[in-house]
């Protein structure tokens, strides 16, 4: 596998699945703002002219689901009926119940550190030193393309852009190192009054060139900009959207394994979310410490049990110390019980709406991106 291609994709904040994710996390944030100990599992479905918000919530807080939903959709940019979805006129339906007491009795404990996991499951975290944010380059730059699409849409640089968009980048690797970009795909929703030629030229100049490093582009790089020729109907009018359907976009773009659990709409007692964040934190600190060039962590849990049922470290032949030694360091320096990792990463705050578009990892504003354990790990490993 000396030379190979690897591809990752991302989607914009206006993609219907991401609209659903953002509504779910906006509801979560509103509840956590009033009640940090709330139990929240919020799922959202969006389609032409309607939003259905459902799930299980146990809290003393009261939040206005309809107002939160409309505000979120408005901020994304769906504000007129020509797009098939309008924050001001769409129907908002709520079907939220309480969390099962059977689950709750397995989670709550007199000693908070003995709080059990909210469900069984396996979670992965990953880091690599191929970018400055210790994330794989394909997903990092795929995110940056659609983030740039939203920026030039909202600031009026390209006023004919609409909220829905997708990106995909194929990188060329040689012996594990990036040598170039083989292909770029960017499909963006647009108004009916822009020609394909003008759109392709503007997207190249205002989105692709400002984002992708010139040294990775060449005359052999292939560009597919709105390759169907037309993308006027999009967003929830084009496809229904559901919370939790973009789990690879949310994580590592396929470069690492995935346990299957989605993130959005879940409070930190759900290890699907919080333990995946903790696993990223562990992997990133191992790479930042110079103990490996690439690192993947797996943790697993049983419902109602505090201690992880397993911890695994894989360094793909790049580790500077043995992997069993790395596992011992993880156990020594990181708290991976559900309550402990919530405290370690300070997760009981309304920070989740921002995670719900453009990736949960590689963004320095989030606490699981800290590398504050790197020096401790390096010293403990005996590396100078």
UniProtKB/Swiss-Prot annotation:
UniProt keyword ATP-binding present: yes
InterPro entries recorded: ADOMET_SYNTHASE_CS (IPR022631), S-AdoMet_synt_C (IPR022630), S-AdoMet_synt_central (IPR022629), S-AdoMet_synt_N (IPR022628), S-AdoMet_synthetase (IPR002133), S-AdoMet_synthetase_sfam (IPR022636)
GO CC terms of this entry: cytoplasm
Annotated region (Flexible loop), positions in chain: 99-109
Binding sites annotated in the UniProt record for K(+): 43
Keywords on record: ATP-binding, Cytoplasm, Magnesium, Metal-binding, Nucleotide-binding, One-carbon metabolism, Potassium, Transferase
Reactions catalysed according to its record: L-methionine + ATP + H2O = S-adenosyl-L-methionine + phosphate + diphosphate
SUPFAM superfamilies with a match to the protein in the record: S-adenosylmethionine synthetase (SSF55973)
Positions contributing to ATP binding: 15, 164-166, 230-231, 239, 245-246, 262, 266
Superkingdom to which the source organism belongs: Bacteria
Pathway recorded for this protein: Amino-acid biosynthesis; S-adenosyl-L-methionine biosynthesis; S-adenosyl-L-methionine from L-methionine: step 1/1
CDD domains xrefs: S-AdoMet_synt
Cofactor binding remark: Binds 2 divalent ions per subunit.
Localization per record: Cytoplasm
Keyword Cytoplasm set for record: yes
EC number: 2.5.1.6
Any GO BP: S-adenosylmethionine biosynthetic process
Residues reported to bind Mg(2+): 17
Broad class of the protein's primary localization: cytoplasm
Residues bound to L-methionine: 56, 99, 239, 270
Pfam family, one: S-AdoMet_synt_M
Cofactor: Mg(2+); K(+)
Job description of the protein: Catalyzes the formation of S-adenosylmethionine (AdoMet) from methionine and ATP. The overall synthetic reaction is composed of two sequential steps, AdoMet formation and the subsequent tripolyphosphate hydrolysis which occurs prior to release of AdoMet from the enzyme.
Family: Belongs to the AdoMet synthase family.
Quaternary state and interactors: Homotetramer; dimer of dimers.
The protein's name in its UniProt record: S-adenosylmethionine synthase
Lineage, uppermost ranks: Bacteria, Pseudomonadati, Pseudomonadota, Gammaproteobacteria, Enterobacterales
Name of the gene encoding the protein in the UniProt record: metK
